[in-house]
């Protein structure tokens, strides 16, 4: 595939996909003339479905997964790219690019990861940087955080990922949890905006993770395998609502910075909340990673309306992970998924977005025992969600694919 194919505008792609279906031979205008057809004039052919159009995008590997975690080893990169090739993902954003601080003379984790991915899989991965919180209690940490961002930009980081460490895991020297909206981080958020580096930010977790830690919890299968994901002890963790409120304060304080609030705004259970936040904050976007099982439980008409309204600010992502084992959105102690399972995982995303199917099994069974219903998005909205929004978000940092030999 050439650079030109990847830069091809949507209109041209639609034409490529639809040409065979819509270009029928033209019948002579005057019947009875030499060579005139004796058959009735052909009827107009219906345009292809959005799913057929999307198949064309997948053939050309145009889709962008904005939310992946892939360990930079030759084996793991190859496994990830094999899956992406099979399902039509051209570019994946690795949110675990690593920190940019050095250990002695050794290159930083970010440099090592980016260098290997660029060498072994050129044009396939975009690397986000992560923050090193060492020295949080030092008086100059705010300046050091900004310096890390500047270094990440110099090294080619396309964006910044903040995990759910803030508010739930990281603590200062006195034992208090670091707050999402701590003023010490404001210079960093501001600098990211100045540099045009988008922020993918994860705060809180599913509402059920604040519920009882027993079989009555609808996410028990997941929680029992991940006890550190349970935050229902109020003596250790803040209410989920407090974390979401802190996130909103950060987004509001930094209108010049683009925040991609992952996992459908970190609150897929509440569509009205997500809708209201997108209305209120033009600098907020959301990805759908690991939350289609939750989104798909809602009334499909309501979900579709939200995607139609905010289609310019919703991004495709999956939380596909490759470390010592592959993870498809979430995982547990069961057998590791196979490459065939990974293909099916992506195909269920296509089914959710591109069909009208009702009551089918979702792609991440460990996340809950329920079914989901599809939302049948039109091709123009699918294009935005699948790749156009990501290209716009990343701008000049979006990779060109190397020319074909």
Language model region names:
Residues 27-123:
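An N-terminally biased module of ancient metal coordination in phosphate/nucleic-acid-related enzymes
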Residues 74, 231, 235, 241-249, ...:
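H/E-rich (His + Asp/Glu) clusters that bind or coordinate divalent metals
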Residues 68-77, 98-110, 134-143, 170, ...:
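Acidic-and-aromatic substrate-binding clefts and catalytic sites of carbohydrate-active enzymes
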């Amino acid at each position: 595939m050439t650079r030109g194919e990847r830069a091809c505008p949507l209109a041209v792609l639609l034409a490529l996909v639809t040409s065979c279906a819509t270009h029928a031979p033209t019948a002579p205008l005057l019947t009875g003339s030499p060579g005139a057809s004796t058959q009735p004039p052909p009827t107009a052919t219906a345009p292809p479905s959005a799913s057929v159009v999307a198949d064309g995008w997948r053939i050309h590997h145009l889709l962008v997964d904005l939310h992946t975690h892939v360990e930079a080893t030759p084996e793991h990169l190859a496994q990830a790219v094999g899956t992406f090739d099979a399902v039509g993902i051209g570019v994946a954003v690795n949110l675990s690019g690593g920190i940019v601080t050095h250990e002695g003379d050794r290159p930083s984790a970010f440099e090592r990861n980016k260098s290997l991915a660029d060498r072994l899989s050129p044009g396939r991965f975009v690397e986000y940087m992560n923050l090193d919180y060492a020295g949080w209690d030092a008086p100059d940490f705010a300046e050091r955080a900004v310096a890390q961002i500047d270094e990440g930009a110099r090294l080619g980081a396309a964006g910044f990922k903040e995990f759910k460490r803030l508010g739930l895991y990281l603590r200062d020297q006195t034992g208090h949890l670091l707050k999402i909206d701590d003023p010490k981080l404001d210079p960093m958020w501001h600098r990211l905006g100045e540099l045009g580096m988008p922020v993918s930010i994860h705060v809180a977790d599913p509402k059920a993770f604040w519920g009882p830690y027993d079989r009555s919890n609808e996410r028990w299968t997941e929680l029992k395998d991940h006890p550190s994901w349970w935050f229902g002890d109020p003596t250790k963790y803040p209410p989920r609502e407090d974390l979401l409120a802190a996130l909103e304060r950060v987004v509001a304080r930094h209108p010049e910075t683009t925040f991609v609030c992952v996992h459908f705004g970190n609150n897929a259970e509440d569509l009205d909340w997500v809708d209201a936040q997108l209305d209120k904050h033009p600098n907020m976007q959301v990805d759908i990673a690991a939350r289609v099982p939750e989104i798909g439980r809602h009334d499909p008409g309501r979900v579709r309306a939200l995607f139609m309204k905010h289609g310019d600010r919703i991004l495709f992502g999956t939380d596909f992970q490759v470390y010592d084992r592959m993870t498809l959105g979430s995982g547990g102690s069961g057998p590791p998924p196979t490459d065939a399972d990974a293909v099916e995982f992506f195909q269920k995303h296509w089914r959710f977005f591109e069909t009208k199917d009702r009551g089918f099994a979702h792609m991440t069974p460990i996340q809950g025992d329920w079914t989901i219903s599809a939302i049948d998005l039109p091709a123009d909205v699918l294009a935005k969600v699948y790749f156009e929004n990501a290209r716009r978000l990343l701008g000049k940092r979006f990779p060109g694919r190397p020319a074909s030999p």
